[in-house]
């Protein structure tokens, strides 16, 4: 079953930055994985902890992460951020 993706305003802006940085194809690969199964491994994902508990993260590259929330009952993935968490 295909999962629906919803993008936050920040994630939409991040996608433009990633395209400009030459990371669009890697990001699209990860988004396709999320559409198929957001808990598929590989590629590996991390469950976030602390204030971000309930969220998941996947590496786009060494610096950038795709951060998302899963709504199992709705088969929905909220894509929250896709840019560096170091800024």
Model region roles, listed by residue range:
Residues 32-58:
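A short, surface-exposed loop/turn module that caps and links secondary-structure elements
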